[in-house]
Amino acid sequence: MSKVLFVKANDRTAEEAVSVKLYEAFLNSYKENHPNDEIVELDLYRENPPYLGRNAINGTFKAGKGMELNEDEKAAAAVADRYLDEFVKADKVVFAFPLWNFAVPAVLHTYVDYLSRAGVTFTYTPEGPKGLMGDKKVALLNARGGFYSEGPMAAMEMSLNYMKTVMGFFGVQDLHTVVIEGHNAVPDDAQKIIENGLAEAKKLAASF
């Protein structure tokens, strides 16, 4: 039995957002095909994690060094530890997120900030940083209304590329992606584009 963490970074409904359609399609297919796995859903907009700042940075640093924390640092470090522990303990992690203004939603960036901790998800070596999450399986589900996989807009895609870079930095080797793109650029083909992407997500979930 695997422990699977589903992370959703969009507070719109499935009727409003393609990335939420992707999330629900993958989740439902996964549940159907892996009925014995333990699933944890993390809705980042519902969680509304505070931005990474002084108290969290100082608190986690001091805790790692065995130093005394003040009350604000303890509270901030506890939040950071909770998200990090949940991620580390998961055998598989699924992220669903849109491309907004060329990047990930701020709430997802904040969440990733909490995951990036030396000595846990990566470590420093004389040869450079080394990821420590090599045994984790990750799926990235991304939706963007325009075409960003190639052509002049490719250099402006900092959503999926950001998440792929972070997961690679963490040492994740078993990385899968499903992307739905162009449904706003070509509205006449939108339904077909979305349906094909959802079918791909369901297929991946069945074997994930």
Curated annotation (Swiss-Prot):
**Membrane-spanning ranges:** none
Q: SUPFAM superfamilies from the xrefs?
A: Flavoproteins (SSF52218)
Look up the signal peptide feature and give its range: none
EC number(s) given by UniProt = 1.6.5.-, 1.7.1.17
The UniProt catalytic activity note for this protein reads: 2 a quinone + NADH + H(+) = 2 a 1,4-benzosemiquinone + NAD(+); N,N-dimethyl-1,4-phenylenediamine + anthranilate + 2 NAD(+) = 2-(4-dimethylaminophenyl)diazenylbenzoate + 2 NADH + 2 H(+)
GO molecular function terms attached to this record:
electron transfer activity; FMN binding; oxidoreductase activity, acting on NAD(P)H as acceptor; oxidoreductase activity, acting on NAD(P)H, quinone or similar compound as acceptor
Necessary cofactors: FMN
- Enzyme class per UniProt: oxidoreductase
InterPro entries to which the protein is assigned, alphabetical? Flavodoxin_fold (IPR003680), Flavoprotein-like_sf (IPR029039), FMN-dep_NADH:Q_OxRdtase_AzoR1 (IPR050104), NADH:quinone_OxRdtase_FMN_depd (IPR023048)
Relay the cofactor remark from the entry: Binds 1 FMN per subunit.
Pfam families, sorted: Flavodoxin_2 (PF02525)
Its assembly, as annotated, is: Homodimer.
In the record, the note on similarity to other proteins reads: Belongs to the azoreductase type 1 family.
Role: Quinone reductase that provides resistance to thiol-specific stress caused by electrophilic quinones.
Please give the name of this protein: FMN-dependent NADH:quinone oxidoreductase 1
Q: Which organism is it from?
A: Bacillus licheniformis (strain ATCC 14580 / DSM 13 / JCM 2505 / CCUG 7422 / NBRC 12200 / NCIMB 9375 / NCTC 10341 / NRRL NRS-1264 / Gibson 46)
